[in-house]
C-alpha cells in the first residue's frame, strides 16, 4: 500500500493520455523542458551574481559616510505660526 505498483502507473498513464490527448502531451513536455532550461539558466546567473557582489558590498561598508542630524521646526520652515496652521 505504501508504493505504487506497475499496474497503478500504467492506469495513471492511460488516464493522463485520455485527459490531455496524445497530441498535447509532446507539446506540454517540450514547454516544460524549455521552462526548466530557462529556470536553470536564471538560477546559474543569480548564483554568479551573488558570488561577484560580496566583494563590492564589503568595500562599500568599509567606509561609511557620517550623517549629521538636524532638527527642523515646521513652523519656522513655513514662516507661519502654529496656531494659524490648524483647521478651524
From Swiss-Prot:
Bias (Basic and acidic residues): 43-52
Keyword Transmembrane tagged: yes
Keywords, in A-Z order: Cell membrane, Membrane, Protein transport, Translocation, Transmembrane, Transmembrane helix, Transport
Gene3D superfamilies in alphabetical order: 1.20.5.3310
GO cellular component labels: TAT protein transport complex
InterPro entries: TatA/B/E, TatA/E
Keyword Transmembrane helix: yes
Region annotation (Disordered) ranges: 43-88
Compositionally biased residues, Polar residues: 57-71
Segments crossing the lipid bilayer: 1-21
Compartment(s) where it occurs, according to its Swiss-Prot or TrEMBL record: Cell membrane
Any GO BP: protein transport by the Tat complex
Main location: membrane
UniProt subunit comment: The Tat system comprises two distinct complexes: a TatABC complex, containing multiple copies of TatA, TatB and TatC subunits, and a separate TatA complex, containing only TatA subunits. Substrates initially bind to the TatABC complex, which probably triggers association of the separate TatA complex to form the active translocon.
Similarity-based family: Belongs to the TatA/E family.
Role this protein plays: Part of the twin-arginine translocation (Tat) system that transports large folded proteins containing a characteristic twin-arginine motif in their signal peptide across membranes. TatA could form the protein-conducting channel of the Tat system.
HAMAP family xrefs: TatA_E (MF_00236)
Protein name: Sec-independent protein translocase protein TatA
Provenance organism: Mycobacterium marinum (strain ATCC BAA-535 / M)
Record gene name: tatA
Amino acid at each position: 500500500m505504501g508504493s505504487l505498483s506497475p499496474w497503478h502507473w500504467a492506469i495513471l498513464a492511460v488516464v493522463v493520455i485520455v485527459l490531455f490527448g496524445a497530441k498535447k502531451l509532446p507539446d506540454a513536455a517540450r514547454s516544460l523542458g524549455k521552462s526548466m532550461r530557462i529556470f536553470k539558466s536564471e538560477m546559474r546567473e543569480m548564483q554568479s551574481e551573488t558570488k561577484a557582489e560580496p566583494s563590492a558590498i564589503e568595500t562599500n561598508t568599509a567606509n561609511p559616510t557620517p550623517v549629521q542630524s538636524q532638527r527642523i521646526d515646521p513652523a519656522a520652515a513655513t514662516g507661519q505660526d502654529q496656531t494659524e496652521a490648524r483647521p478651524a
